[in-house]
Amino acid sequence: MFDNKTILITGGTGSFGHTFIPLTLKKYNPKKLIILSRDEMKQWDMAKLYADDPRVRFFIGDVKDRDRMYRALDGVDYVVHAAATKIVPTAEYN
């Protein structure tokens, strides 16, 4: 399914991404796995884990930014939408 495909995972530096990414890289052979996250520090930390894997790319962005999302989606075959706000009162307030 994901073999030789480009996958974008929104919220990829979160808890779901930490499980999904290594599993996908091991079980399938994606052409590219783009990790979209608004958290630069989490991307920096995660980039160290995948520094030797040219299939893994990082993209700073927010799913609420339409122009940034259009740019991130260019050439993507599949989107795994895992972006979320975990703190319910914050999500309800905003």
Language-model features: locations:
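Phosphate-coordination loops involved in phosphoryl transfer and adenosine-cofactor binding
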Residues: 3-6, 30, 76
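Catalytic, metal-anchored helix/loop core of enzyme active sites in primary metabolism
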Residues: 1-4, 15, 55, 64
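Conserved glycine-rich Rossmann-like NAD(P)H-binding loop of the short-chain dehydrogenase/reductase
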Residues: 28-42
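Glycine/Thr-rich phosphate-binding loops of Rossmann-like dinucleotide-binding domains
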Residues: 17, 43, 88-89
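NAD(P)H-binding glycine-rich loop region in Rossmannoid oxidoreductase-like domains
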Residues: 50-94
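Conserved Rossmann-like nucleotide-binding pocket used by diverse enzymes
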Residues: 8, 34, 59
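Short alpha-helix adjacent to the SAM-binding motif of class I
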Residues: 42-49
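N-terminal Rossmann NAD(P)H-binding glycine-rich loop of SDR-like oxidoreductase domains
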Residues: 5-27
